[in-house]
From Swiss-Prot:
Belongs to the peptidase A1 family. Disulfide bonds join 190-193, 196-271, 217-235, 222-230, 307-500, 419-461. Keywords: Aspartyl protease, Disulfide bond, DNA-binding, Endoplasmic reticulum, Hydrolase, Protease, Signal. It is an enzyme of class 3 (hydrolase). It comes from the Eukaryota. It comes from Arabidopsis thaliana (Mouse-ear cress). One of its GO terms (molecular function) is aspartic-type peptidase activity. Inhibited by pepstatin A. It is found in: Endoplasmic reticulum. It holds the Pfam family TAXi_C. Coiled coil: none annotated. This is Protein ASPARTIC PROTEASE IN GUARD CELL 1. One of its GO terms (biological process) is response to abscisic acid.
């Protein structure tokens, strides 16, 4: 009789353990993922807004320019501020519908990414400046074929996505310039033009500025160019972009004015007499990169920050120098530098989470290796975040796993391989996506920063893409609506949500 009682007791214990285990497992399995709400209607309304936007009635052209007669000279601790506009508020859309606009954006985005990857590859492989030195004939005009250079990132096909209005010269002539964290050389189109594309403001005439000075071939700034030549003891420069666009001219210095915030003397900038490419009305480019010729280094800025508004909203924000205001609740990350190339701003990224769960990734997948390859850069000119292939696949698969109940859209659209059909919805709950940075801080993305419309009929795609390179790039779609602060004195990146 004892043996049956033992079996009965064993059965009770086993059943109790089974029920306990099952209960714990069911609680774990029933824990819902974290979600965001995507406003489908609002996003689709903005697709119509940007197509119908009339730049002649926007703040870019209806607001009187600030008086440039009173700004004081800038010192390295002075704050400066500029209004920031998105590219698609700058000129009237030539696209028949939002899908064609999207495809155009993605095409030029691919050109830019290819340029960034190529520039870093040249640096990693140790291409010497002497290998790039052009042969120049004293008797010739500006000939682009005489100035060969590696492909570099920048405003290829007008891919500069954000603009500010800057004054150049004395008296200051205002003009719109592309802002680019992936470029160092500042340049504008100049008279006389061997070949100039159309811009919205008159082309700058250096003879109209009392502070304009051509730089000689022996000037220290000339030796800092990746590609330079000499003619009549004037330093010539060339910058080339991913699609074959370029600017060629002489390197000079002049006064640069930031509205009424202040002005800076003797800024080195290219005066481009031969310029080719669709730069969308901008007069040139203001380089915000980490190299010595960038405006940030020339003005000895201790910090700069920007907040990128939604490209489809038609609104503006600001670019601020020397006004760090990081709060305790803001996400921060290490600002890292690549010893092989100083242009780009690398950020310490450790991974992602989807629906509140960390995505499993190999350690050091986002590190810069000993050769200078890999890592993650923060770039305002790249639109869609690119991830090293293994990281992208893991992130995408985690997102797909939590969206099996959502109606799938087209199998792929350009860069995107994960799309949904939200045409019958006004709002939809989607899993959260967050960046996790080295040091433990994280940034939760709004749903509209990772699910974006690609047409005006309700197709939304997961706004990340893989790259065959080991380099990853955090693009401006994921940055929109977040104040990004580059604290150059402390080597910290700050990310403050909803601070535009």
């Amino acid at each position: 009789m004892a043996f049956p009682r033992f079996l009965s007791l064993l059965a009770v214990v086993t059943l109790s353990l089974f029920l306990t285990t099952t209960d714990a497992s069911s609680r774990s399995l029933s824990t819902p993922p974290k979600t965001n709400v995507l406003d489908v209607v609002s996003s689709l309304q903005q697709t119509q807004t940007i197509l119908s936007l009339d730049p002649t009635r926007s703040s870019l052209t209806t607001t009187k320019p600030e008086s440039l007669s009173d700004p004081v000279f800038f010192n390295s601790s002075s704050p400066l501020s500029l209004e920031l506009h998105s590219r698609d508020t700058f000129v009237a859309s030539q696209h028949k519908d939002y899908k064609s606009l999207t495809l155009s954006r993605l095409e030029r985005d691919s050109s830019r990414v290819a340029g960034i990857v190529a520039k870093i590859r040249f640096a990693v492989e140790g291409v010497d400046r002497s290998d790039l030195k052009p042969v120049y004939n004293e008797d010739t005009r500006y000939q682009t074929e005489d100035l060969t250079t590696p492909v570099v990132s920048g405003a290829s096909q007008g891919s500069g996505e954000y603009f500010s209005r800057i004054g150049v010269g004395t008296p200051a002539k205002e003009m719109y310039l592309v802002l680019d964290t992936g470029s160092d050389v500042n340049w504008i189109q100049c008279e006389p033009c061997a070949d100039c594309y159309q811009q919205s403001d008159p082309v700058f005439n250096p003879t109209s500025s009392s502070t304009y000075k051509s730089l000689t071939c022996s000037a220290p700034q000339c030796s800092l160019l990746e590609t330079s030549a000499c003619r009549s003891n004037k330093c010539l420069y060339q910058v080339s972009y991913g699609d074959g666009s370029f600017t060629v001219g002489e390197l000079a210095t002049d006064t640069v004015t930031f509205g009424n915030s202040g002005k800076i003397n003797n800024v080195a900038l290219g005066c481009g007499h031969d310029n080719e490419g669709l730069f969308t009305g901008a007069a040139g480019l203001l380089g915000l990169g980490g190299g010595v010729l960038s405006i940030t280094n020339q003005m000895k800025a201790t910090s700069f920050s920007y907040c990128l508004v939604d490209r489809d909203s038609g609104k503006s924000s600001s670019l601020d120098f020397n006004s760090v205001q990081l709060g305790g609740g803001d996400a921060t990350a290490p600002l890292l530098r690549n010893k092989k190339i100083d242009t780009f701003y690398y950020v310490g990224l450790s991974g992602f989470s989807v629906g509140g769960e960390k995505v499993v990734l190999p350690d050091a997948i986002f590190d810069v290796d000993a050769s200078g390859s890999g890592g993650v850069i923060l770039d305002c000119g790249t639109a869609v975040t690119r991830l090293q292939t293994q990281a992208y696949n893991s992130l995408r698969d985690a997102f797909l796993k939590l969206t099996v109940n959502l109606k799938k859209g087209s199998s792929s659209i350009s860069l995107f391989d994960t799309c949904y059909d939200f045409s019958s919805l006004s709002t939809v709950k989607v899993p959260t996506v967050a960046f996790h940075f080295t040091g433990g801080k994280s940034l939760d993305l709004p749903a509209k920063n990772y699910l974006i419309p690609v047409d005006d009929s309700g197709t939304f795609c997961f706004a990340f893409a893989p790259t065959s390179s080991s380099l990853s790039i955090i693009g401006n779609v994921q940055q929109q609506g977040t104040r990004i602060t580059y604290d150059l004195s402390k080597n910290v990146i700050g990310l403050s949500g909803n601070k535009c």
